[in-house]
């Protein structure tokens, strides 16, 4: 039975993460970039000012919502989304890309990220535009909703939209237990055992207790943790990586040359048939790029849609920044650490004798930090992997709620918490492979919806810049539903009246 499941999984995985799936992901990002006039480059200063820049200049971005308001702040939604995307893939995944595809894979990882910025932008614009409130007053958004109410509203597409939404939700639930929970916890337990000799079961029980306290408390509690955890873990890892890169600054030109030269090298990584190398390089770069930032998978949309933002484009810009931070910053630093410390051969990506790709980053940190290196990586993986678990707990919760309502989501949370112990104590080879496939299967229905609704994304974006930049007096496109549109307009009018009142005092 296991052999049959393995063979079927290999076929499906080869489809979703093979040439078809990666080409679909690439072409979607390219199409959206063209349709928006390459927004990610042309408006780079604008989206940086309204995301990371706004954290320091606009208190509304970081201010917590009231107890009665079930939404979370823009900063909290960004941190929770990054919690879900910044994981072990940013450490081990980058090493795998270099070993399997050579240093040139990093170039193609960048390409996928640069195009993926607009896929993430479109997902989040649609997520906010088609979101709905549940009986508790929480915003529910994501691919399930823009497939049902967006694609499903097109002539003859009602059944198609609904079926794709159900498939997406099912794949998301299955992926949340694997790549969003057990695989991450297993990675934590293994590294804590290797670095600090902690028993696997002890790690699992400790993480189960902490997860129960956070996850069962709902999104607001998850967001309250991630808004502190994500900046901390990012600063911790980035600081350590920067120290190593600066220590080996003289090797940076050679590392960058290897990346750009290797991107178009016909020889395979580690040797191989002529012409096969560039195919492997592109494939591994694209695959690891997609894994690291999840643009196109539709996962982070579910938490970004819970933001207290009114403008869909504002949340879309946060999506652009999330991909930028995940891949262009964190993954790039990991790559430079590997390529500047001499643990791989720059021409081929071949590793030092006796070193496996999953230990490559640890070897690089050990070369720089000595015996502290493995401990640094163990703590980094603890923070990265556990934050991923918190983010995915919300994704799975919302997928279950879409299918079974809020009662079902409560049961899901209990099961999710219990699975942390399973993840810490079991060997998960097949489980990892299956969850990887389910993660990819989420991408197909999501990208169908994003492509079908790309015109809506363009219309919303043009409406935003017409009002906010050119000052045109036109009705905003905030929601696809009249009741929420009027509600948002009433809130905006009240806020404007308060500002006028304060200005006249």
Question: Language-model segments: which ranges?
Answer:
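N-terminal alpha-helical transmembrane segments of multi-pass membrane transport
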Residues: 1-84, 88, 99-105, 116, ...
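Transmembrane helix-loop junctions in multi-pass membrane proteins
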Residues: 4-5, 35-40, 90-94, 176-189, ...
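Membrane-interface loop-to-helix entry segments
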Residues: 24-49, 164, 168, 185-192, ...
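Helix-loop-helix module between adjacent transmembrane segments
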Residues: 32-33, 112-137, 148-186, 190-214, ...
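Flexible loop linkers connecting adjacent transmembrane helices
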Residues: 38-72, 96-106, 110, 118-159, ...
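Alpha-helical membrane segments and immediately flanking helix-loop junctions
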Residues: 59-98, 126-129, 135-151, 173, ...
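Membrane-interface alpha-helices at helix entry/exit sites of multi-pass transporters
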Residues: 67-71, 102-111, 149, 153-166, ...
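Extracellular/periplasmic helix-exit of transmembrane alpha-helices
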Residues: 123-136, 242-258, 266, 270-273, ...
């Amino acid at each position: 039975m296991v052999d049959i499941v393995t063979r079927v999984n290999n076929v499906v995985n080869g489809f979703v993460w093979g040439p078809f799936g990666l080409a679909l992901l690439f072409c979607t990002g390219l199409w959206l970039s063209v349709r928006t006039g390459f927004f990610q480059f042309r408006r780079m200063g604008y989206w940086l000012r309204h995301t990371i820049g706004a954290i320091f200049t606009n208190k509304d971005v970081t201010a917590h919502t009231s107890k009665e308001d079930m939404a979370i702040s823009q900063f909290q939604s960004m941190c929770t989304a990054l919690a879900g995307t910044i994981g072990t893939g940013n450490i081990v995944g980058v090493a795998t890309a270099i070993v399997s595809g050579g240093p040139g894979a990093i170039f193609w990882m960048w390409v996928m990220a640069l195009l993926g910025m607009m896929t993430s932008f479109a997902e989040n614009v649609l997520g906010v535009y088609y979101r709905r409130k549940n009986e508790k007053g929480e915003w529910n958004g994501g691919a399930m909703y823009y497939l049902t109410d967006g694609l499903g509203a097109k002539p003859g597409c009602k059944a198609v939209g609904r079926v794709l939404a159900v498939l997406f939700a099912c794949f998301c639930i299955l992926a949340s237990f694997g790549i969003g929970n057990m695989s991450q916890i297993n990675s934590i337990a293994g590294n804590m055992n290797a670095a600090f000799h902690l028993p696997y079961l002890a790690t699992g029980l400790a993480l189960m207790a902490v997860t129960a306290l956070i996850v069962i408390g709902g999104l607001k509690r998850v967001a309250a943790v991630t808004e502190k955890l994500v900046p901390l873990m990012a600063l911790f890892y980035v600081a350590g990586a920067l120290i190593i890169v600066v220590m080996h600054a003289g090797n940076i030109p050679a590392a960058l040359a290897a990346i750009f030269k290797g991107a178009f090298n016909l020889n395979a990584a580690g040797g191989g048939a002529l012409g096969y190398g560039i195919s492997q390089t592109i494939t591994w770069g694209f695959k690891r790029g997609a894994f690291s930032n999840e643009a196109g998978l539709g996962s982070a949309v579910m938490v970004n849609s819970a933001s207290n933002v009114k403008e869909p484009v504002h949340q879309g810009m946060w999506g652009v920044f999330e991909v930028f931070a995940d891949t262009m910053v964190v993954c790039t630093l990991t790559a430079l650490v590997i390529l500047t410390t001499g643990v791989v051969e720059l021409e081929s990506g071949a590793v030092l004798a006796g070193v496996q790709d999953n230990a490559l980053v640890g070897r690089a940190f050990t070369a720089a930090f000595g015996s502290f290196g493995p401990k640094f990586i163990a703590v980094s993986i603890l923070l990265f992997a556990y934050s991923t678990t918190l983010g995915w707990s919300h994704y799975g919760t919302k997928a279950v709620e879409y299918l079974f309502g809020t009662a079902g989501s409560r049961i899901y949370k209990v099961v999710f918490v219990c699975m942390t112990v399973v993840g810490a104590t079991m060997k998960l080879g097949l489980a990892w492979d299956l969850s990887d496939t389910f993660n990819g299967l989420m991408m197909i229905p999501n990208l169908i919806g994003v492509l079908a609704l790309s015109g809506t994304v363009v219309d919303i974006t043009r409406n935003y810049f017409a009002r906010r930049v050119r000052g045109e007096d036109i009705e905003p496109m905030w929601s696809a539903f009249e009741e929420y549109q009027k509600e948002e307009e009433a809130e905006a009018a009240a806020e404007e009246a308060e500002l006028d009142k304060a200005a006249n005092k």
